[in-house]
Design a protein with these regions (language model features):
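Short mixed-charge
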Residues: 185-205
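Helical cap/lid subdomains and adjacent loops of hydrolase enzymes that gate the active-site channel
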Residues: 176-178
């Protein structure tokens, strides 16, 4: 949404083919003249290559991931394929078809795992404690290797808590904020009724 404020910027959103696609988080800008959905899947090398080859992006921002830490224990191979191999596929496609493209990969504080000190910095050792954390560590090192080996503009940002109205309601912090909003609405609704009743039962003069 922020990028679309620039009339010179065209934004492509990569999405997997699905019988029941969910457009809830893109409804505010899906119809923007400078935005377009394209099909692609981080687990499919050919589709990622086609995206880079056909679009020729100046920037490639990868926020896609299987991001449920608990679920990563149930399907570790899939999590590694999406979060680590998916980044590798992006880097390979950029190297082949648009080496001047600037690539950003989203990391996670889960990379640090069992922490030695807080707050962590880039010098803190990475000791992940879940397949999810390990997959993000792998992506981190792949980005570094490709940047140094092929002179690509590739960076990996380690993200900590990040929130927004479009964050899934299955996350703990979203449950908390929704609960706060519900309580506020209930209190506000009660206060409105009290004010209404007070006004209804009061004498008033017209001025």
């Amino acid at each position: 949404e922020y990028l679309l404020r620039d009339p010179q910027c065209r934004v492509f959103g990569m999405m997997r083919r699905s019988a029941n696609p969910n457009f809830q988080n893109t409804k505010n800008f899906a119809d923007h003249e400078n935005f377009k959905f394209i099909f692609g899947d981080l687990t499919d090398t050919i589709s990622v290559e086609n995206v880079v080859k056909n679009i020729q992006p100046d920037y490639f921002i990868n926020f896609a991931a299987n991001s449920f830490v608990g679920c990563s224990w149930d399907m570790p191979l899939h999590v590694m394929d999406v979060n680590a191999n998916g980044v590798l596929r992006c880097l390979e496609a950029i190297k082949k078809f648009k080496p001047e493209c600037r690539f950003y990969s989203a990391g996670s504080s889960e990379q640090f795992g069992d922490v030695d000190y807080s707050p962590q910095d880039i010098k803190h050792p990475m000791k992940p404690r879940s397949p999810y954390g390990a997959s993000k560590c792998a992506a981190h090192h792949l980005v570094k290797v490709y940047r140094e080996s092929y002179d690509l503009y590739a960076v990996h940002g380690i993200l900590f808590n990040h929130e927004g109205t479009k964050r899934g309601e299955e996350f703990v912090t979203r449950k908390i904020t929704k609960g706060v909003a519900r309580i506020f609405n209930e209190i506000f609704s009660t206060q409105k009724k009290r004010i209404y009743n007070a006004l209804k039962n009061s004498d008033a003069d017209s001025v």
